[in-house]
Amino acid sequence: MRFSLSTTAAALAVSLAFAPGWAVAWEKDKTYDITILHTNDHHGHFWQNDHGEYGLAAQKTLVDDIRKQVAAAGGSLLLLSGGDINTGVPESDLQDAEPDFRGMNLVGYDAMAIGNHEFDNPLSVLRQQEKWATFPLLSANIYQKSTQQRLFKPYALFDKQGVKIAVIGLTTDDTAKIGNPEYFTDIEFRVPATEAKQVVEQLRKTEKPDIIIAATHMGHYDDGKHGSNAPGDVEMARSLPAGYLDMIVGGHSQDPVCMASENHKQADYVPGTPCAPDRQNGTWIVQAHEWGKYVGRADFKFRNGELKLVSYQLIPINLKKKVEKADGTSERIFYTQEIAQDPSMLKLLTPFEQQGKAQLDVKVGSVNGKLEGDRSKVRFEQTNLARLLLAAQMERAGADFAVMSGGGVRDSIDAGDITYKDVLKVQPFGNTLVYADMKGSEVEKYLAVVANKKVDSGAYAQFANVSLVADGKGVSNVKIQGKPLDPNKTYRLATLNFNALGGDGYPKIDTLPSYVNTGFIDAEVLKQYIEKHSPLDASQYQPKGEIVYK
């Protein structure tokens, strides 16, 4: 398949229900207009935020308008999601993302890729979500260990006016490492690129599609430099024979894939400005940031077996910028024209929002400054919010020190009142507090592993009551509670079951004789700590350079 670019491209891929058979093939010398719309990393944001940004109601209005435009021009349209529908907004989490899947039905999604956060719950919850969805959830590289069979549909087929489109779903094989090990006892995540090659070759022999799209949840890493993460879209595109994939529509890294130059994304993409997707080995690669902040739109022309991208854009969904006024005050204004909320979507989602808010808008405490939990911070440096979480865990477990993955801190808490919703946004996974007693010599070995997890990954460790120097291989100058580590003394470590079972590649400690799973949910532990110690002084939890990296 030959591609030529007029502007730029994208589409977050995944696939739809299997077609019973292909209709009449495309006609020679006839041009077919095909539009791919896409989103990814929705993470429970079915409702607009407090500033009136994004949300499925405005998304539906936009998508409906585009559908009308495309239909009027005689074209065809697919709407795809790159996965991670689950986890991030308490109103959604408490209802197992039912409002999100039902809302996606109403928007008219054709298919979605399965993301790693679809496994934040037991498989039974994901199976229920499949029932709620009127579109298929796809992944070609997730297998059941006991049967060696795929757990989900690997691809879906679409016939768009005789143009045959296959969409393959792929999930990061990091899922087994970054997800809850308790849920993966009979599940394995195989290498996506290997499975993609097999499926493409199968499709070429059997279905003979004109266009093949990989809907992936693997991440986009500039120039294929994925660090401690599993290889992503760029690496896969380079590893496959040229022409195997026409497009990769991705997610997971939660980036607007808008290239500034070859192999380098724009560092700070401004909503509403031009966006050029990546291209590797003849394959277009796209991603639409996160949370439904954008709908990606790729407009193609297909003629005589050639697919040409004529335009691409990321369309902001009511995103706003903060501007300072002459009187010293500030206001938020839209980057682009406001999109009205669809009444039918509001009617569907309002009961879910009300049910969730009734449980969540309860004040549990207050804080006099921001508690930092932004993704751009907790995966790179020690933060005061992580210290607060760990302080709560230490107090409940009677521990000497505590450790957790930075990726487990999911949001910040602003100064002012703290609600139960705020707590659940920070810790949405429902992990349990665990502890284990270890000799100082064992502690040093443990810290040597976790302290050297790479920055810019969810595994990056957050610490409390620990000071040390990490050099990439080991640790030195280790102190617990400000005192030098005694190799013969017994210390109690508090952490979460996710890490204790080997999540994020941490040493497994669940086999230690002293290991105890308290059964206390992390968010509930944090909630009770805040209630007990409010008003909180944010400065008391501020890191003071205890963790040094060489």
Swiss-Prot record:
Binding site for a divalent metal cation 1: D41, H43, D84, Q254
SUPFAM superfamilies reported for this sequence: 5'-nucleotidase (syn. UDP-sugar hydrolase), C-terminal domain, Metallo-dependent phosphatases
Compartments where found: Periplasm
Signal sequence residues: 1-25
Cofactor: binding details: Divalent metal cations. Most likely Co(2+).
PROSITE patterns: 5_NUCLEOTIDASE_1, 5_NUCLEOTIDASE_2
EC number: 3.6.1.45, 3.1.3.5
GO terms under cellular component: outer membrane-bounded periplasmic space
Annotated binding of a divalent metal cation 2, by residue: D84, N116, H217, H252
InterPro entries: 5'-Nucleotdase_C, 5'-Nucleotdase_C_sf, 5'-Nucleotdase_CS, 5_nucleotidase/apyrase, Calcineurin-like_PHP_ApaH, Metallo-depent_PP-like
Positions bearing the site annotation: Transition state stabilizer: H117, D120
A GO MF term: nucleotide binding
GO biological process assignments: nucleotide catabolic process
Reactions performed catalytically: UDP-sugar + H2O = UMP + alpha-D-aldose 1-phosphate; a ribonucleoside 5'-phosphate + H2O = a ribonucleoside + phosphate
Cofactor list: Co(2+)
Binding site for substrate: R375, S376, K377, V378, R379, F498, N499, A500, L501, G502, G503, D504
Disulfide linkage: C258-C275
Pfam families: 5_nucleotid_C (PF02872), Metallophos (PF00149)
Keywords (A to Z) from UniProt: Cobalt, Disulfide bond, Hydrolase, Metal-binding, Nucleotide-binding, Periplasm, Signal
Function summary: Degradation of external UDP-glucose to uridine monophosphate and glucose-1-phosphate, which can then be used by the cell.
Membership in a protein family: Belongs to the 5'-nucleotidase family.
Name of the protein in question: Protein UshA
UniProt organism field: Yersinia enterocolitica serotype O:8 / biotype 1B (strain NCTC 13174 / 8081)
